[in-house]
Amino acid sequence: MNISIINYIAVVTAVVSQLACHKSDRLVEDNVENARVQLSSLLALSEEGDTLRIPSTFKAGEVEFVPEDDWVSGFFAGTLWYMYELTADEMWADHARVHTEKLDSIQYLTWHHDVGFMVFDSFGNGLRIKNIPEYRDKILTTAHSLSTRFRTGAGVLQSWNVDRGWQAERGWKCPVIIDNMMNLEILFNATRMSGDSTFFKIAVSHADRTLENHFRPDASSYHVVDYDPETGEVLHRCTAQGYADESAWARGQAWALYGFATAYSYTGFERYLEQSEKVAAYIIGRLPEDGVPYWDFDAPDIPDTYRDASSAAIMASAFYHLYSITGTIQYRQTADKMLSSLSSPAYRAEPGTNGGFILMHSVGSLPHGSNIDVPLNYADYYFLEALIRRSKLK
């Protein structure tokens, strides 16, 4: 080939790549500006009056708030930390710290597994971003609290207690949900901070048992696996928030994708990366055209059913992470498509609407009639995380 033609192709390729980067930057910048407007409004409402409140969703024209011990309580503080990371505006860090420290008592909570979400997304981000020394002890105490839920005979962290609420009606003994993969990160970090390998060993045991028992041959994940806590025997495989026991609940697949990629990052164990990539292939093969999944991949009324923006946001963040690990371009392309769709008027709220939340059209738990087709604080959290991960890619 003529040298001049080769040089021409190289120049064109470089220009196209540069334009793509500029387009990427514009998408991030546009979303940050939108988030600034929305979250400023939501922040003001959360701090109105004498009581600091934790916004979770917006329904029937009203923002709804949750108590500190709700599983979603850490996401708003984490969202504020992400806004600081995206803007370098100290105002966001100041408010993030206030909302984080409201959750101080959660480090002692032992009656469910979601303390990883609650504390690591708040105190964990604060420690990572601002290196606030006292946050280290909060994380270690939380890791100890979470570790009390480890059932040695089964080798897993029990997700829910079964002595109260709707969980008591299911006949479970030691239910483990795929979501629990997301709570292992705080254990991995606790070992790094303390040198105590107990946390690491618990996290690996749980991940290995999940790898062994949660997945179907097509790499889709069950939502719930119930164990005998003494023997480790699998008693049931079923769902709580999906369409059916054998269906693929979208957010469950998102947790699996994200959780195993994260476990690989902390351990270097190839089996975790392989599982995350198997889940990735399953998801990519079943996504609708715009990349935003329906609430369950097997919902019987597709396409006339709800999308779940929260699942797309979690998946987008996880796909960027997988791309940074493997360099597989399909992962970046999938994440880019998801972010592009979530940034469109179909899913991103206009400034001044949606109660101050960024994204519309998420689904909490359709079987429970809870938070259907509404904004959710964790959708916004993972959306901003995906923007951060995208902005850091070369």
Annotate each predicted stretch with a short phrase.
Residues S24-K394:
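Glycan-recognition and catalytic cores of secretory/periplasmic carbohydrate-active enzymes
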